């Protein structure tokens, strides 16, 4: 018969071993579902969010994040206002416009620091400045994406509503009409449509087009640019108990995703390709390189909104008739992004030393 004291000691020892085996094991905690509404289809434009999901950064903050693709007809501000998503990604003017109808979106992190919007033309058109667009067929996407162009035209003394000044032509979200000569100057993002031209063959040479075959007007350089991709949420949602803390943690994880994509571009492109992105690897590699150049360096830290840039954006949106009246209140805040940056500790949140890579494009962006 065993000694009762021995049995007690054995039981205690087994409990101790069991306790030691659980040291450092994560507690079983239910994840909070979070939905993020994109403004466009999955591509490297949104790489940081896909990276945060793939690398487990959102999960580390206690979130089960669903990333919802966008499309032409989807307005993220309306989706968020209707409670179908907690967070959205949007150009700032497209978030502001629904506020005139009662939406309450507020920017909580300004991720893109600079505008990537261009007007692109072939060299033989001799369009080197906005004034040269007079009498030309000028492509515009519409859907609120034309405001920088319209503001630039007006600054150059041209009326986009007057066909005697400039012939505004509806442009698809590609460069096919431009390549066919149906548009003299096409709207393009440096991270997307501009590269689409460089991925096409010049029929005169049977070689790919080169940057020197093109003239480019940058609305950022001309002074009529708008703040674009920002993370926003509903003011009413943020006012509910605990949701500001949720927002800070979401921003922290998202910023980590963008930092990862800055420092690990090749792996980040592979993550994007797994997200059902339609454009091929070569094009996504170019896109991420250019998107990183729009985000970094971030002089005050990723996500911090510059007040002067926001005010300029509002004015451009008013000039472009995206907004019909001055903005009421201050629909942006930096306090949540600042807390997220502080929570990242010693991480490089400014990217001051980051430099663009050289990306060689191939036909079709493959």
Regions found by a protein language model. Name each.
Residues 1-32, 346-366:
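Short, low-complexity disordered leader/linker segments with a strong preference
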Residues 27-180, 184-191, 211-213, 217-219:
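Short, glycine-/small- and polar/acidic-enriched structural segments
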Residues 48-51, 97, 148-152, 196, ...:
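Alpha-helical scaffold segments in soluble metabolic enzymes
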Residues 66, 73-75, 166-168, 214-217, ...:
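Short linear loop/turn motifs
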Residues 84-85, 89, 293-304, 339-346:
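Short amphipathic alpha-helical segments at helix boundaries and their inter-helical linkers
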Residues 93, 125, 173-176, 183-278:
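Pocket-lining segment of extracytoplasmic ligand-binding domains
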Residues 241-324:
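Secondary-structure end/capping motifs
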Residues 311-366:
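Conserved C-terminal helix/tail region of periplasmic/extracytoplasmic solute-binding proteins
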